[in-house]
Amino acid sequence: TAWEGYEKIPSWIMEGYGTMASEAAEQLREAAINRPSHVFVQAGVGSLAGAVVGYFANLYPDNPPTFVVMEATNAACLYKGAVAADGEPRIVTGDMPTIMAGLCCGEPNTLGWDILRNHVTAFVACPDWVAARGMRILGAPEKGDPRVISGESGAVGAGLISTLMTDDSYAELRDLIGLDKTSNVLMFSTEGDTDPEHYRKVVWDGAYPAE
C-alpha cells in the first residue's frame, strides 16, 4: 500500500495494474463494445481498483462508466472511508477473517483512495458467500458461456452482479447504480484456484451457501 512519504513504488505497481485495464479496453474494442456501462472491480488496499478506475475515467472523460468497488466485509476499509464521507481514508484493524485472502487488507493505498473517492458510485462490502456464489457461477456457466476457473478474490464481482440481478432485497443498490439486463459490465477475475482443495469445497461441495 502507499502512505504519505511512501508513494513512488506503489505508483509503479498501479501503473502495472493499468496495463491490465488497457488490455481490457483493447479487447472491448475488438468485441465492438465502445464503452462498458459498468466497471466492477475488487479491492484490497485499492491499488488495482484505483488503477482500473483511473484508467477508464480518463478513457471516457465525458461519459465514464458507473464504477463499483467490492471488498471483503471484514476488511472493508474503502467502504468505511466512503461511509464517513469526509474524504479521509479509514483503517480496519484486528482480525479480518474472510475466504477472500487477496482482499484481506485493512489499510488503503492513499494514491488509490484519492482516485476512488472521486469516481466510484458504490463501495460494496461483500460477505464470503457472495464470492463463493461467483466461483460456482463462473465454474459452471450457462450453456454457451465460457468456463472460468476463478478463486475467491477473483469471483466476487460475478457473485455480486448475480445477486443484485436476482434478489430484489438488493433492489435499492441495483437501482442506485443503474444495473439492468441492458448493461454491459466489465469485471476482472484476478486469481485462479490458488487453493485447489478449497476451490473444490466451494464449487463442488457448496461451501459458503447464500444467506
Where are the predicted features?
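Active-site-adjacent helical/loop segments in soluble small-molecule enzymes
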Residues: 3, 14, 107-177
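Glycine-rich phosphate/pyrophosphate-binding loop at beta-loop-alpha junctions
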Residues: 3-118, 173-211
